[in-house]
From Swiss-Prot:
Major subcellular site: cytoplasm
Organism: Pseudomonas syringae pv. syringae (strain B728a)
Lineage, opening ranks: Bacteria, Pseudomonadati, Pseudomonadota, Gammaproteobacteria, Pseudomonadales
Gene that this polypeptide is encoded by: queA
Protein known as: S-adenosylmethionine:tRNA ribosyltransferase-isomerase
Domain of life: Bacteria
One Gene Ontology molecular-function label: S-adenosylmethionine:tRNA ribosyltransferase-isomerase activity
Pfam families xrefs: Queuosine_synth (PF02547)
Pathway: tRNA modification; tRNA-queuosine biosynthesis
Assembly description: Monomer.
Length: 354
């Protein structure tokens, strides 16, 4: 399969650069997997698509203010984007500067703080901070908005680029499907008899990296840390026993559940995953999906295509553009039920040069 099969033209005006006034006021495009039928709704209409006995699985990771500014002891300015917190004082980070810092060199953080560059691991730098990392980031860090939002972060982003149920600090990008849920909507979901469970996947900055190969099968995913607890395994089993559906809120919840069920059986799991779900890959756990609209040629669009079918997904995106849906992190959402027989892009016939 070619990466180019997953491209589409998106007007710049449809990129959502700010959140709406209320989380729940976004629009919802529903895609029925078995038929490909589309319907244009509001996000609060999601309640109509849920059934008593269903199980919704959310990602409770918390976005950390992972962007820091500072200077090397030699005076050169730099920007740090934390990719992963290793322990209380060490991180792996992307560092942007005119010259890369050398092992043993000191970095002075704007707003107060100091770090030492310990080692380089390919594109990432291991940094050790003099004080505990998470309190430092909360004090002087900036929210790591995605590159396509293309504006400085604002005070409101600390709240709005975060789900209302975020608990476990460690992500440098939000699990954006969850941004649409406010507390009253969660209470209404519970009142309908829908159960909830929480996994953790700390979303890394690699989620925004473009696919740099021509053939999908040649792509290697970045790794991210996740945890699927025994409570989630038990909740899924109970859902199956009562005839309910497992509904993943966001692609990170899908990747968590399917990573923990790679052999076909869901088991508790804690560790790194580099699972890459694209058309042709089976789904062992997830029956329905709440997700935002994703970037062209992204691995997330490929995951949705694997779930809903390639032609159905691309038709849905074309309809979303035609109807002016807002795209990406602060944009609108989809509710998709799984296609039982999804198809992949058709292989192009070789050209005849005779």
């Amino acid at each position: 399969m070619r990466v180019a099969d997953f491209t589409f033209e998106l007007p710049d005006s449809l990129i959502a650069r700010h959140p709406l006034a209320e989380r729940r006021s976004s629009r919802l495009l529903t895609l029925d997997g078995p038929t490909g039928a589309l319907a244009h709704r509001q996000f609060t209409d999601l309640l109509e698509h849920l059934r008593p006995g269903d199980l919704m699985v959310f990602n409770n990771t918390r976005v950390i203010p992972a962007r820091l500014f500072g200077q090397k002891a030699s005076g050169g300015k730099l920007e740090i984007l934390v990719e992963r917190v290793l322990d209380s004082h060490r991180v792996l980070a992307h560092v942007r500067s005119s010259k890369s810092p050398k092992p043993g060199s000191s970095i002075l953080i704007d707003g107060g703080g100091e770090a030492e560059m310990v080692a380089r691991h390919d594109a990432l730098f291991e940094l050790r901070f003099a004080e505990e990392v998470l309190p430092l980031l909360e004090r002087v860090g900036r929210m790591p908005l995605p590159p396509y939002i293309d504006r400085p972060d604002e005070g409101a982003d600390r709240e709005r680029y975060q789900t209302v149920y975020a608990q476990r600090a460690g992500a440098v990008a939000a699990p954006t499907a969850g941004l649409h849920f406010d507390q009253p909507l969660l209470e209404a979901i519970a009142a309908k008899g829908v159960e909830t469970a929480f996994v953790t996947l700390h979303v890394g900055a690699g989620t925004f990296q473009p696919v740099r190969v021509e053939q999908i099968e040649d792509h290697h995913m970045h790794s991210e840390w996740l945890e699927v607890g025994q409570d989630v395994v038990d909740a899924v089993a109970a859902c199956r026993a009562r005839g309910g559906r497992v509904i993943a809120v966001g692609t990170t919840s899908v990747r968590s559940l399917e990573s923990a069920a790679r052999d076909g059986e869901l088991k508790s799991f804690s560790g790194d995953t580099d699972i890459f779900i694209y058309p042709g890959r089976p789904f062992h756990v997830v029956d329905a999906l709440v997700t935002n609209f994703h970037l062209p040629e992204s691995t997330l669009l490929m995951l949705v295509s694997a779930f809903a079918g390639y032609p159905e997904t691309m038709a849905a995106y074309a309809a979303a553009i035609e109807h002016g849906y807002r795209f990406f992190s602060y944009g609108d959402a989809m509710f998709i039920t799984r296609n039982p027989a999804p198809t992949a892009p058709q292989e192009s016939a070789p050209e005849d040069h005779a």
